[in-house]
């Protein structure tokens, strides 16, 4: 009797499924953007430019090599908007939404993947959470579009409806894509509306709301103002977000935007403190800002939004955990603490790992681009921070970069969006080791 060898079936982890899902959608988006119908001139867009745009949209970044408003047709803009929406919600969440709408049962494996994709604390209630994510997203985007309608319809007529919807989704998903460029004035973002309090406030609010995280919004909608019932994570996110909004606003108001009326200075300062985390819109000339302000924006870009949100970056909780651990070390305490709760040691390790990974990608990418393009390192650091944190702000060099440098930015955007732990666990597995080696002390500092 002939015995055939048995082949062990390879089971993909949840983290590998998330990465594969993003990569597949990214490639399909690039192929659609290459079609002649996607460009206003009905030309075939080079693959590397289509892939760059698709990655930027799916990873809700906003860096572009072609002006979105003047280069892409309505079809191309629609593809970009769809990619933004998928990227903001997450490929797995969108897939789960279609499964729920079609009446299919969600398997245990699929629930596990959904849990990882949404940064939910447990698998229980994940289907209900997915439904909540879809409802809250639709609510914010539709209300935002309605508030933007008067401004855009006054300037663009009936086309203003499309502009309002596009910019509302782009803002809530922290994407930073805009349609305001023309053949005569490309890559202008929201600079022409810098003095418009309604538009800048609505866009800024959508950016903040999208960056808070869906679990935080679940607490807000469930417990209203009963703050002591919020998850510790939600409290940390709200406090850290407020800290990262107020202090940069004060700095920009006092030291950067010193000309103009008080209202103009407040609007500019507020918006430029919001948009680096991690939207990509701008109402000021970024290249004209002082070097200290640009450095502050790089820091804000790297910190990013909150876990389980539409934003990218290292995340506010990573920053908060590192600060709490540093404070505990100063006080010779064994554990970091928040709001009367002890932080698990694994969270501190993960925070340090994520911060180290983002900083490594940030510096390494800038080094490669600076070498390849012969550009100042400071400009390249700004660009790579924007890419790896999926922000979309630039000092104007993106369209002029060569294919190698564009490839570096594509990789940084993709790696930044799928997340640090997702990458680590997909590559090395998420199962803890069952054996431990002998311990020995090492001097630190």
Predicted segments with their positions:
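Membrane-proximal intracellular helices of multi-pass ion channels
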Residues: 1-445
């Amino acid at each position: 009797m002939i015995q055939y060898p048995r082949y062990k079936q390879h089971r993909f982890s949840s983290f590998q499924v998330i990465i594969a899902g993003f990569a597949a959608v990214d490639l399909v988006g690039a192929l659609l953007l290459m079609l002649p119908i996607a460009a206003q001139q009905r030309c075939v867009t080079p693959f590397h430019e289509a892939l760059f745009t698709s990655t930027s949209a799916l990873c809700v970044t906003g860096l572009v090599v072609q002006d979105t408003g003047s280069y892409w047709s309505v079809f191309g803009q629609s593809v970009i908007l769809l990619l933004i929406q998928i990227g903001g919600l997450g490929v797995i969440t969108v897939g789960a939404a279609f499964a729920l709408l079609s009446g299919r049962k969600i398997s245990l494996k699929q629930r596990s993947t959904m849990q990882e994709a949404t940064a939910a604390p447990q698998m229980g209630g994940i289907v209900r959470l997915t439904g909540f994510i879809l409802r809250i997203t639709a609510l914010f985007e539709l209300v935002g579009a309605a508030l933007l309608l008067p401004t855009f319809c006054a300037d663009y007529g009936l086309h203003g409806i499309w502009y309002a919807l596009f910019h509302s989704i782009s803002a809530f998903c922290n994407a930073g894509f805009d349609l305001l460029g023309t053949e005569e004035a490309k890559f202008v973002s929201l600079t022409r509306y810098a003095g418009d309090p309604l538009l800048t406030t609505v866009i800024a609010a959508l950016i903040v709301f999208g960056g808070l995280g869906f679990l935080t919004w679940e607490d807000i909608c469930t417990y209203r103002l009963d703050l002591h019932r919020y998850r510790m994570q939600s409290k940390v996110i709200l406090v850290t977000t407020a800290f990262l909004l107020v202090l940069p606003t004060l700095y920009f108001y006092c030291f950067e935007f010193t000309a103009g009326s008080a209202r103009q200075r407040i609007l500019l300062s507020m918006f430029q403190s919001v948009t680096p985390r991690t939207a990509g819109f701008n109402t000021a000339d970024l290249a004209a800002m002082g070097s200290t302000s640009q450095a502050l924006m790089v820091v804000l870009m790297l910190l990013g939004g909150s876990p389980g949100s539409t934003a990218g970056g290292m995340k506010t909780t990573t920053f908060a955990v590192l600060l709490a651990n540093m404070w505990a070390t100063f006080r010779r305490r064994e554990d970091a603490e928040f709001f009367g709760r002890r932080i698990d040691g694994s969270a501190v390790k993960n925070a340090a790992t994520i911060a180290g990974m983002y900083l490594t990608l940030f510096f390494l990418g800038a080094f490669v681009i600076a070498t390849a393009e012969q550009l100042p390192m400071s400009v390249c650091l700004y660009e790579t921070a924007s890419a790896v944190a999926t922000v979309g702000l630039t000092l104007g060099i993106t369209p002029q970069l060569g294919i190698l440098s564009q490839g570096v930015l594509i990789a940084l955007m993709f790696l930044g969006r799928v997340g640090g732990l997702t990458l680590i666990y997909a590559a090395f597995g998420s199962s803890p080791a069952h054996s431990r080696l002998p311990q020995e002390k090492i001097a630190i500092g």
